Amino acid sequence: MALLKPLHDLSLRFPDYEKFDLAAQMRRACKSIPANIAEGYGKKRSARDFKAYLANALGSTNEMIVHLQIAKALGYISGEESESFVGDYRIVGKQLTRLLERWR
């Protein structure tokens, strides 16, 4: 959740023509990570069920990394901003991967 507000604010700086494209995709992807974890935990009837939601959260994490790289390539964010957010999302990805591997 700590990344949600800074990422949302970052996406609002994108050009108007990206409002319903890359910026919106980024906002949806960053929100889906904690939402999938919470929904999966709330609906867990088995380890398999919860892991499916964790896998979706991991997919959204990887999607965020790509969106940030695209935003950098298009000049919407600086290299520093991209590296910082990408590093944070890589950490989230590693945490989700470990949780997926260890959840019983």
Question: Where on the chain are the PLM-derived regions?
Answer:
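Amphipathic alpha-helical assembly/interaction segments
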Residues: M1-R104
